[in-house]
């Protein structure tokens, strides 16, 4: 499997953990891309989207792996433009910038944690 997109957490907004606890979701955004959103997002290093993320790909988050089950119609574009997408863990959504995932529980999110999408 080839790595399609890989970034590391640089900052965690105060509301970002709350979103994970209450909505099983994480909002990702390039570090410094939108300072007014910093409280709500997990900021990360800038990364290059080498190929589009598609259903069947794998997200590795620390040592935990998740299967991509849906990719919103705008998710790859927003990742490419500003590292932005919303990850939904073991739940469904309908927004165009969301990526749905299934797998085990989400590990603790900390600065330095790596997010890596891989696939064919």
Over which residues does each language-model region extend?
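N-terminal disorder-to-order initiation segments that are Gly/Lys/Arg-biased
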Residues: 1-40, 113-114
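Short, ordered loop/turn segments at secondary-structure junctions
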Residues: 32, 72-74, 120
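Conserved "cap/hinge" positions at secondary-structure junctions
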Residues: 62-63, 119
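Short, conserved beta-turn/loop elements at beta-strand boundaries and strand-helix junctions
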Residues: 64-65, 71-77
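Short, solvent-exposed secondary-structure boundary/capping segments
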Residues: 75-86
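Helix-rich interaction surfaces within compact, conserved domain-sized segments
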Residues: 89-120
């Amino acid at each position: 499997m080839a790595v399609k997109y890989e970034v590391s957490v640089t900052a965690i907004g105060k509301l970002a953990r709350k979103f994970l606890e209450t909505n099983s979701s994480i909002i990702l955004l390039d570090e410094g891309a939108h300072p007014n959103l910093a409280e709500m997002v997990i900021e990360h290093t800038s990364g290059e989207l080498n190929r589009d993320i598609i259903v069947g790909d794998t997200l590795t988050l620390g040592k935990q792996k998740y299967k991509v089950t849906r990719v919103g119609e705008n998710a790859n574009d927003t990742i490419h433009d500003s590292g932005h997408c919303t990850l939904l863990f073991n739940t469904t959504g309908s927004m165009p910038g969301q990526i749905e995932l299934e797998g085990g529980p989400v590990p603790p999110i900390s600065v330095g944690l790596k997010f890596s999408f891989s696939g064919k």
